[in-house]
Amino acid sequence: MNINDFDFDLPEELIAQTPLEKRSESRLLILDPKTEELEDRHFYDIIDELEAGDALVLNNTRVLPARLHGERAETGGHIELLLLKDMGENRWETLAKPARKMKVGEEVVFGDGRLKAVVVEILEHGGRIVEFKYDGIFLEILESLGEMPLPPYIHEQLEDQERYQTVFAKENGSAAAPTAGLHYTPELLEKIADKGVKIVELTLHVGLGTFRPVSVDNVDEHHMHSEFYRLTEEAAAQLRAVKASGHKIFASGTTSIRTLETIGSKFDGDIQADSGWTDIFIKPGYEWKVVDAFNTNFHLPKSTLVMLVAAFAGRDFVLEAYQHAIDEKYRFFSFGDAMFVRSKNK
């Protein structure tokens, strides 16, 4: 497979720069892989796609205010640090700007000096492992000093930081939001639960690799970044019961999909409690283990996320749906509109 098989022309004005005032009023394009029909709806209509006894799986990760601005202790020069991965023992994998200034042993001071970082290792791809020094609670210091790391294609300032969090976000650790979940409101989730749908949560901490472009022409040569995931015993038991009863598992977003399919691949289609790091790459030809249907946003051309959707619904149909969305002026990417991909077995 060639990377250009997943390309399309996207007018820049369709890239949403700000979220809608009301989350669930975004548009929803419904894709039916069986009939290859498309339907224009609104996100609050997603309740019509769910039936009593089904499960809706949400990713409860919370985005960290992971962008820090500091000064080199030695010279006072400005340094921007972006936290990517918690390595434990106060050490984080980071991206630094300007990176060339950040040599091993270099110290950076943030804010009033409550937080300091020392470079302990330089990584092959140019990242830096830093060790933080501080008094107090790290997350509280980060909340007061850090900024939300919005995606590179969003150029507007976000007035309300919570609009880049889902309403069910609780597990700190992501460098980016699981954007498919941004459309849900407490009221919509309550209506879905009242219908008899089980709402099940898992955790996958989204890394910035989600925005990293594929750099090879041959898709099979691409290696995914790894991300931490967790599915609890209670959640796994709920999902097993849904499957056993013949009902469907609906995943909200590619992060929920990648978690469930990682576990399904690991346990031969069974759903077990598990945690660890996943670098699963779902592309056309993949054999699905767990997920029956899902909602997701509209993704970047030539991205692994477009490939994931194509693996489920077929490349030609997905590109047809994307062209329809462009023609109908749907809003794209993190703050944009959504699609719902129905089960192939419905």
Curated annotation (Swiss-Prot):
Q: What does this protein do?
A: Transfers and isomerizes the ribose moiety from AdoMet to the 7-aminomethyl group of 7-deazaguanine (preQ1-tRNA) to give epoxyqueuosine (oQ-tRNA).
Q: Spell out the family assignment given in the record's similarity comment.
A: Belongs to the QueA family.
Q: Name one GO cellular component term.
A: cytoplasm
> What is the protein name stated in its UniProt record?
S-adenosylmethionine:tRNA ribosyltransferase-isomerase
Task: List this protein's GO terms for biological process.
Answer: queuosine biosynthetic process; tRNA wobble guanine modification
One MF annotation (Gene Ontology) recorded for this entry: S-adenosylmethionine:tRNA ribosyltransferase-isomerase activity
* Residues making up the signal peptide according to the UniProt record: none
Q: Which Pfam families match?
A: Queuosine_synth
As recorded in UniProt, coiled-coil segments are none
Specify the pathway: tRNA modification; tRNA-queuosine biosynthesis
Q: Superkingdom, according to UniProt?
A: Bacteria
The kind of enzyme this is, by top-level EC class, is transferase
What Enzyme Commission number(s) apply to this enzyme? Answer: 2.4.99.17
The subunit structure is: Monomer.
Q: Which InterPro entries match?
A: QueA, QueA_dom1, QueA_dom2, QueA_sf
Reactions catalysed, semicolon-separated, are:
7-aminomethyl-7-carbaguanosine(34) in tRNA + S-adenosyl-L-methionine = epoxyqueuosine(34) in tRNA + adenine + L-methionine + 2 H(+)
What gene does the UniProt entry assign to this protein? queA
